[in-house]
Amino acid sequence: DGITVNRISLANIQKVSNCKADLYIEKRLTGRYYLIRNVEIPNGVTLILDNFTNFNTAAGEFGLYIKLTDGDSFELTGDINPGNGTTTVPGTNTIFLSEVSVGDDIEISGETRTVTDIITDVSLTVSATYSDDLTTDTTPTCNPTALVDVIIN
């Protein structure tokens, strides 16, 4: 309330994929005004919006909202055999440090888990164990989260 926004920066900090962003101002009764809509931000790129026209930021007037959509799913490098009864997932010829981020979903042999830690290029941990009877998956899939740093000043 009563805050002036001069610049907004959105930086895609994902390791591999692009993300999409919507940035809009919404007034309680009159709807949304999109500053950007469905804009794809490549990984490693910062989108800067500045020179905002002043708008009434009195209590209850406007809200500033950012909606982020993750990038497309992609096939991970290497093979994964998670059927070891633990949340530690071993890989063979994988490059987890380069391709995966904490919060990403990993699908292995039809089962999906969320990455909670990346230990090395060939080892990460997930939110729950995979079934013990899974065989090695040579085409594991990553569904990345939308990792974007937002700076408003």
Positions of predicted regions on the chain:
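Extracellular and analogous surface-interaction loops
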Residues: 1-2, 13, 53-57, 93-96
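C-terminal interaction-tip segments
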Residues: 1-3, 7, 11-16, 20, ...
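Intrinsic-disorder/low-complexity, polar/charged segments enriched in Ser/Thr/Lys/Arg/Asp/Glu/Gln
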Residues: 3-7, 46-48, 88, 123
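Short, surface-exposed beta-strand/strand-loop-strand elements in extracellular ectodomains
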Residues: 15-37
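Beta-strand-rich, repetitive solenoid scaffolds
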Residues: 23-25, 36-38, 50, 67, ...
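A short beta-strand motif that forms part of the nucleic acid-binding face
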Residues: 25-27, 53, 128-130
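Aromatic- and Gly/Pro-enriched, solvent-exposed loop/edge beta-strand patches characteristic
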Residues: 29-73
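Autoprocessing Asn-cyclization modules and mimics
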Residues: 73-144
